[in-house]
Amino acid sequence: VAQVLPAAPSPFPRPRRIGAMSSFKMPETPVIVAGGFGGPAVMFTVTPFRNGLTLGATNSAAGFMELYGQVFAKGFRGGWTGGIYPATAACPQFLCLGPAYHFYASFAGVAGGVFLTSVTETAIVYGAETCNAQMAKNQKSPGSIKNVHPSWKPYGPGFGIHVFRNIIATAGLRMFCTPCTWLIEKASGKSNALTTLGGDFAGNVCAACLSAPVHQLYNFTVTTPELGSLGMSEQKERMIQFLKDQYLETKDGRTRLSAVVPRDLFMRSMYVAVAYTMYSSLERALVANWPR
């Protein structure tokens, strides 16, 4: 008779059942620690990358080096202008990306967890990110935005765009990394910490590239105050025109992707892929090494 080995211990306690239709699992301590403390540190670290993207939304002519130069135009510390607001919001934001995602996924599945996490994340960080974007705009062009969006206000222009962007980014963290890791392991013939890190980064780069135009549309929306005085149809036309101006060019009667496309894909990857890969690596390390 074959011996039945005990199952490997789960990182989560036994599911608590509510009625007969659903169950959920509460995340363990290291996942909560990663979200509560690691998230703010990660989001503050990548502030210059986020500010560079913001400036790029209203400057399609500048290359990424020029945009990063503008970010640091007032000194090294100036690169972190407004970063305290997303960093503060990152505590509940990454509690959402980590513990809340695992909670949602335990009863709604991976796709449902990604959607619910993204909506919750937007409700938490929309105000802080919008405030940060407008402060970055004002640093480059003082007085451009007279009434900066309050960091505590969880709604405003571009809210739905923000949710859509987060769905793509969260999918990268929770859905794209595993197949990317598998491909790297198959190609290299190895499975170790480096292949896992590479898979995480590749998955997050994929999501960053897919979400880049959505993120820039959000930045355009929140740093263009005159949109608020336009009707819905006019706003839609301006947004479509922004995407065309940003990513398409016509030359010799032919329309093609503009040089801004690789710039924005690179800058979005530097922001999102670096931040989420740092976070996923920290979360994994804490779960593996936390005292039992």
Predicted segments, located by residue:
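Aromatic- and glycine-enriched pocket-lining scaffold segments that form the walls
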Residues: 170
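Interfacial helix-start motif at the membrane-water boundary
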Residues: 72-90
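Alpha-helical transmembrane segments of multi-pass membrane proteins
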Residues: 41-54
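The first (N-terminal) embedded transmembrane alpha-helix
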Residues: 35-42, 87-95
